[in-house]
Regions:
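Boundary at the C-terminal end of the N-terminal hydrophobic targeting segment
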Residues: 18-22
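A short acidic-to-branched-hydrophobic micro-motif
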Residues: 62-91, 152-154
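Short acidic/polar N-terminal linker immediately downstream of export determinants
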Residues: 24-34, 52
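Solvent-exposed coil/turn segments that connect beta secondary-structure elements
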Residues: 35, 70, 80-82, 126, ...
Length: 185
């Protein structure tokens, strides 16, 4: 009887471990009604807002949804509405990002989403507070402008973790991004 009980207990524990492993790999579909987008993420994002300043000094809000996984793997979606009287430049935005993070642009290409123009780029960066001090991070990003709203998706990870599995995770994330109710420009 003890052997039977032990076998059943082992089977139940094994089954629960398998189920918990499967659930930890499931992604959620996050929808932002205010941001007018949806995206798949590995967990519910943390939402924040910060004030930014345009080149002409005008202040405007930027909204951010982010998920950080163990190992410093981060998924971020930011958006803001273009400041009235300004013209958005994807190239200037890219250059500003590279400069702000003291990074090196590795690659870039033109992309589009639902007819809206965009840029995809990859940057290598060494954060000021990186541990160890020689840690290098990879920033894969997609930038879109749609109906005077700018979206920036980023997938950030330590370069030491670069792998096919992580690349597949980035593709899953980026390819899941969808715009809500917008009309083509």
């Amino acid at each position: 009887m003890r052997k039977y009980f032990a076998a059943v207990l082992l089977l139940l524990v094994s089954a629960s471990l398998v189920l918990s492993i499967q659930k930890s790999g499931e992604w959620i579909k996050y929808t932002s009604p205010e941001g007018r987008y949806s995206v798949s993420l590995p967990a519910q994002p943390k939402l924040t807002m910060q004030e930014a300043t345009a080149a002409d000094g005008q202040k405007f809000p930027q909204y951010l949804a982010s998920v950080i996984e163990p190992g410093d793997v981060a998924f971020t979606i930011g958006y803001f509405d273009s400041v009235p009287g300004t013209i958005f430049s994807a190239q200037a935005a890219r250059d500003g990002i590279v400069k702000r993070i003291n990074g090196t642009l590795i690659s870039e290409s033109a992309i589009s989403l639902s007819g809206y123009p965009g840029r995809e780029f990859k940057i290598l960066m060494k954060p000021a507070r990186a541990r160890p001090a020689d840690a290098t991070y990879v920033v894969r990003a997609r930038l879109y402008e749609a109906d005077k709203r700018v979206y920036l998706l980023q997938f950030i990870f330590p370069q030491s973790l670069e792998s096919d599995a992580l690349a597949a995770k980035a593709v899953k994330y980026f390819d899941s991004f969808q715009l809500g109710e917008l009309s083509p420009m």
